[in-house]
Amino acid sequence: MPDKSWHLERRTFLKGVGVTLALPWLEGMSWSNDRGSAATPPNRFCTVYFPFGIADLTENDARAQFGWWPLGEGRDYQFSKTLEPLAPLRDQITPLAGLDHPAGYELGGHGTAGIFLTGGLRNKTRTLNRVSADQVVAEHLGRETRFQSLVCSTEGGVGALLNSNTLSYDRSGNPLPGIAEPSALFDMLFGAAQARQTLRTQASVLDRLLESTRELNGQLGAADRRKLDEYLFSVRGVEQEIVRARGWLDTPNARVDAAELNLACNIKNDPRAYLRVVYDLLFLAFQTDSTRVATFLTGNMRGESQYSAAAAWPKAAGVREEAHKVKHDAGSKPEDASRYDAFLLEQFAYFMTRLQDAREGDATLLDRTLLLYGSSNSTSHANTNYPLILAGGRSLGFKHGQYLKFPAKRVPMSNLLLTAIQRLDVRVESFADSTGVLSELT
């Protein structure tokens, strides 16, 4: 693990009366690489996904103000009521229309969250995904951080491929489980004792598993051995993470005062507080350089949304109907969908503002953090014309303050993902079904 050094210790703390607080970035804390020479602060990438689509109203509709899309286009666009929470951040965002994944056209309306960052499944039998864009970036940006990436999800775990609880998939197309509980996320990021215990448990389980599979392998036929080999390939990924974690055990965790965070909240008792504390933890993870890549799925696409975390969002926004129905009825009751989506955007704007208010040398964390916010549905779960917002990343060359509309079904969203990947200094020529980069963004 690289040894990071600063002119002042980066993880310097104020101590007193039993409280420990991590200091913010100070001018004396200039970045340096592992050889001690001056280096630019790191780039970061975060994707946030919301389920069930939007009120997809045309500009000629009398109720267009309650739709998702801005009115007008280019630099003269006007915010809809739905997007108004982002108005103070206008010069930091680019709403996008017309992009989607052609590979998702034939999937059911509830089946595309898992391909949002992958561009499409790997096989026609719909059993294997591709690597997600965040993991391509994490392989590059995550080399010098304690955690290669963070995977957050209101549901936790992985779900099913066509009903995913995670946005992140590894090189083999295997899902990476999301963390749902704020307290668990905090302990993972900042709890040194917890990290040691977790590592011991994981290592013990892995050792027993590998021993058992070695004994089993000799008893299996050829077909079963192939299946077992595929499984063990995934297990080796876990083994590599354990080796990685061991390399960081003697490096102190960044220390953050838990008393400043509402870790006890949950989605049911306080949806707004839940979203904000997850965003707080993502902010702290970036600020302390614990990771440089993160994803956050704010609800899966289960049709029975009363069993999904997404059930909490309409209630918090003052909408009586459950999440799934709100979006199915968005054409006839766009006001409800607007309040629902504006509530989620209000919390995303809170995250953006925290990043914007945090200075890092001659820029801000937001300038060096590329954010992608969106859904893989438009109206009534149609898998076309995704509602997308690109934000931040001005130090990476992104130019905001405009609304870009691309021709329908002509430009794959993979072009956006390729643009992001390349701007984050990852050397790739293509991603999924990309046909090029979006030069309009830079």
Pin down the residues of each PLM region.
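Ligand-binding pockets and gating/stacking loops
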Residues: 1-442
